[in-house]
Structure formats: C-alpha cells, structure tokens
Amino acid sequence: MTGLMAGAVMSIAASNAPVMAQEITVITPYLAQPGTQMFIEGFKAEATNMGWTPNVIDTAGDIAAVISRIEDAVTKQVDAIVINVDPAQIEAGLAVAKEAGIPVIGMDSGTSPLLVSNITSNGYAMAAETSVYVANRIEGKGKVVMFVFDAFPPVQIRGVVADAIFGNFPDIEVIDRVTPDVSDGGIADSRAKMEAILAANPEAGSIAAVWAAWDQPALGALQAIEDAGRGGEGIVIVGIDANPQARDAIAAGGNFEASVAQDFVGIGKMTAGVVARAIKGETIKESVIYVPTVLITSANVGQ
C-alpha cells in the first residue's frame, strides 16, 4: 500500500511539473506592433517559468520569410513553434512542421487544421462594441471612415463585423475603407491617408467618425484631424487594443473616445500554457481559445 501511495504521489508530482522543453520558436512578421510586443512579453515570462528557452524571430513584415523560419525550426528539431501570422499564408511551412510532428500554436493568428489551437481575443465581439459605440455616438447618421487590414484574419473579422453594423444604419455612409501600410507600425501612413480624406471633405461636420480595426490607424487619424485644426468638429474616433498611446489619447478627452483592451500579456501566457499541454501530448479540443476583453472609455481609462 505504501508503495502504491508513493507511486501515486510521484505521478501527481510529475503531472504538475514544468514541461522541460529544449526549445520553443516564436515567429512573427509584426513585432513592430505594440500588441505583438506584449504578446511576446507574456509568452516569454511564462516560458521562462516553465524552464523553456524561447527563441523569438521577427521577419519584419516579410510573410514569405515565416515559411523559411518554420523550416529552420523544424531542422533544429524544436519542441514547439508559435506563430503570429495568418496561417493560410504559410501553409507550406505548417505542413513541414506537421510532417515532423512538431506542434504549432497560433498566438492571435487565425485558425487552421494545421494548428493545435489559436489563442486570441474575440474579434467579432470587439468590433461589435466599438462600431455600435460609434453608431450610438453619432446618433445613427453621418459619414464614417474605416481603417481595416484584411490580410490578417484577427483584424479582417473586425472589419466584417463593423461593415455589417454600419450597414444596418441607413443614414450611416462609409465613405472610405482604408488599408494602411503597416510596415512601420501603421501610424504614419494612416495619418497621411486621413489627411487626404480630410482634404477631400473640407466642410466642417462632413465626417462624423473614424472607426479603426486597431489603435495605430486611430492614432494616425487623430494626428491628422488635430493638425488640420478640425478637432473641434466632434469627429468620434475609436480603435481596438487600448495600447498606452491610445489610453493617453482617450484620457485627454479629445476625439479619440474608445478602444477595447485586449489582455495581450494574458494571451501570451495562455499561449504558453497551450504549448505546454501540446508538448505533453494532450489533445486540445478548442480550435480557438478566447481571452476576455474590456471596452475602454473616459469613464474607466484611469482604472
């Protein structure tokens, strides 16, 4: 009996022990984005606690290079790979990892049969909150500018939801659906594109709102509006992510009124937890795992 009890204790201890992985590779083309930086921060913190050696690779906007980096990781026989990119664009690399038996986990990436799971925020819900906020603030009428990025699934779905909501208000007109250059983060090009839109709509009050699928374009639009001296027109700006710059802008009480706080660090930590489960050989039933979010306005930005 004593031997059985000792064996049981050892079994429980083993199941709760850290997963000692030789190496985990994290690959992203979007490290210039503040949100991605926080994903990585959370992942690395949890990975270190588990005794892993996380290797973070930034391809600096080069999607094709992600495939090569996955192949390199497979050659090195890493224990797991984490991606932060549209899996549909890198299927060749994912197939190589699958063939090698190396689990690949998405960190705010998008879903794919070649992934164990994707850990992210609920983009549908976030877009619904911010687009409904805009519709209510402008009382269901006026011209709206949208900033989208359909090349990346977690952001693409936000635009789809906003399209549907604005389309349900007969007196709301989406006058432009802008896809900014995100190679430098997205603020500069969003600002330039918003400047052009303002120039094409010079009448005061001609633009009611700017809806952005993430904060960087919203911040760029804010700069353009303020520089044009049109901040007093009451143009409502919303974003998604609630990064520090966005929070500061919301707290300032100007045109940038709302964003959604994603738990970026929490997504990173949750991703590490799913990696641990995958390495142990556990079957992950959920193709998508959502981490909760919070709408941020002037009412709660200081909390």
Tell me what each language-model feature is:
Residues 17-303:
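A residue-level marker of the well-folded mature domains of exported/periplasmic proteins
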Residues 4-18:
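C-terminal segment of classical bacterial N-terminal signal peptides
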